[in-house]
Amino acid sequence: GVKKLEEVVKDNSQIMSILCGHLHRHIQFQWGGTTVQVAPSLSIERTLTLDNKMKKEYIDEPTGSLIYLYNDQLGLVCHTDYFGEYKKYSYSRI
């Protein structure tokens, strides 16, 4: 179960991160001595609920994905990419 998996993760320091998806919400937390990251949805997002008593609904937020790169100097690097057409601005306007 969950406790056994947590023990395995804790006992294997080479595990840099646990990556998963399909909760329709981008979530990141520490567990078993490593970072767990849930990718955002590719289709529709759920409203942010911080406990099980809050109403669960879907919301029309930008969808996206996580892009991971491994770098010998930095290790695992993650970028979030949102899908859609958004207005772009040049640096001179900022």
Language-model segment annotations:
Residues 1-16:
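Active-site-proximal segments of metal-dependent phosphoesterases and phosphodiesterases across multiple
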Residues 8, 26-94:
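Binuclear metal-dependent phosphoesterase catalytic core
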Residues 14-24, 37-39:
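Active-site neighborhood of phospho(di)ester-bond hydrolases with catalytic His/Asp-centered motifs
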